[in-house]
């Protein structure tokens, strides 16, 4: 009960008991010294003198200077050893981060990256070559259900169209080498230059009312076949006529 009340109320005063001379004489309790009141400042008003007279026991003051330090030194050596200096590494030196927070740390990381990679220039955009550009953009309409996306028509600029027209004026057919040069100069692909010249030749033939080469070749082949058939028929007719003339008539044989 005493312990529970002491835990609940921290201001509990431990009771003081008088010297038990009677108990000592009877031998019930051994002589362990006189009890004395526990000095504790509780804030409550109490009597200046204890309720019971104290014995002549004088409490010796605790001298902190006379404490043996051998055990403490061993304890400090084992548990509170001073941290060893950290060896410096060969990498970039990092200083303690100021109170700036994450911004200062990020700026230091950027400076470290610039020191490690000095060749990389800041703010320089990568060079995009013509062959790296995407030529055809795949624009899929909402109603298109096909598996392969349709190609969008290439929109030639005014300068590109003018240069292609100049080249077509001098040469309607391009060699492979010339096509590569034009494509590299105008930032186009070889396929774009080839298709443009094919379409331009068809337009030129329509303007000059010239037949298509494919249609003309097929018509000439059919006409040659029909002419060969007519020639064979004429030869057969001539052979028939000549045979009729050589055969004698029955009137001439009777005479």
Swiss-Prot record:
List, alphabetically, the Pfam families matched. Answer: Homeodomain
Q: Motif Antp-type hexapeptide: residue span? A: 128-133
Q: Where is the composition biased (Basic and acidic residues)?
A: 34-49
Subcellular compartments: Nucleus
Q: Name one GO cellular component term.
A: nucleoplasm
Instruction: Write the signal peptide boundaries.
Output: none
Chain intervals with Low complexity compositional bias: 217-245
Region listing for Disordered, in residue ranges = 28-102, 207-255
Q: Does the keyword Transcription regulation apply?
A: yes
The record's annotation in PROSITE patterns points to: ANTENNAPEDIA (PS00032), HOMEOBOX_1 (PS00027), HOMEOBOX_2 (PS50071)
GO term, biological process aspect, one: embryonic skeletal system morphogenesis
Q: What is its main location?
A: nucleus
**Keywords of this entry:** Developmental protein, DNA-binding, Homeobox, Nucleus, Transcription, Transcription regulation
This entry's Gene Ontology molecular function terms read: DNA-binding transcription factor activity, RNA polymerase II-specific; RNA polymerase II cis-regulatory region sequence-specific DNA binding
Q: Which superkingdom is the protein from?
A: Eukaryota
Q: Which Gene3D superfamilies match?
A: Homeodomain-like
Q: What function does the entry list?
A: Sequence-specific transcription factor which is part of a developmental regulatory system that provides cells with specific positional identities on the anterior-posterior axis.
Similarity section? Belongs to the Antp homeobox family. Deformed subfamily.
Protein name per UniProt: Homeobox protein Hox-A4a
- Source organism of the structure: Takifugu rubripes
Gene name of the encoded protein = hoxa4a
């Amino acid at each position: 009960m005493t312990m529970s009340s002491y835990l609940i109320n921290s201001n509990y005063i431990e009771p003081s008991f008088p010297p038990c001379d009677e108990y000592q004489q009877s031998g019930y309790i051994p002589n362990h010294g006189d009890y004395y009141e526990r000095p504790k400042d509780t804030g409550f008003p109490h009597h200046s003198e204890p309720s019971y007279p104290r014995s002549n026991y004088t409490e010796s003051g605790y001298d902190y200077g006379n404490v043996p330090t051998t055990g403490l030194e061993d304890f400090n050596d084992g548990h509170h050893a001073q941290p060893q200096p950290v060896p410096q590494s060969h990498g970039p030196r990092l200083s303690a981060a100021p109170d700036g927070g994450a911004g200062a740390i990020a700026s230091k990381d950027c400076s470290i990256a610039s020191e490690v990679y000095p060749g990389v220039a800041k703010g320089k955009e990568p060079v995009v070559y013509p062959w790296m550009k995407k030529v055809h953009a795949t624009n899929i309409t909402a109603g298109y259900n096909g598996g392969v996306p349709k190609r969008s028509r290439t929109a030639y600029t005014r300068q590109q169209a003018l240069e292609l027209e100049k080249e077509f004026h001098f040469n309607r057919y391009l060699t492979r080498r010339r096509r590569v040069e034009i494509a590299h100069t105008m930032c186009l692909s070889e396929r774009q230059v080839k298709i443009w010249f094919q379409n331009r030749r068809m337009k030129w033939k329509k303007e000059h009312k010239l037949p298509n080469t494919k249609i003309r070749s097929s018509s000439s082949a059919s006409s040659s076949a029909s002419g060969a058939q007519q020639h064979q028929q004429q030869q057969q007719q001539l052979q028939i006529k000549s045979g009729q003339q050589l055969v004698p008539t029955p009137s001439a044989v009777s005479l």
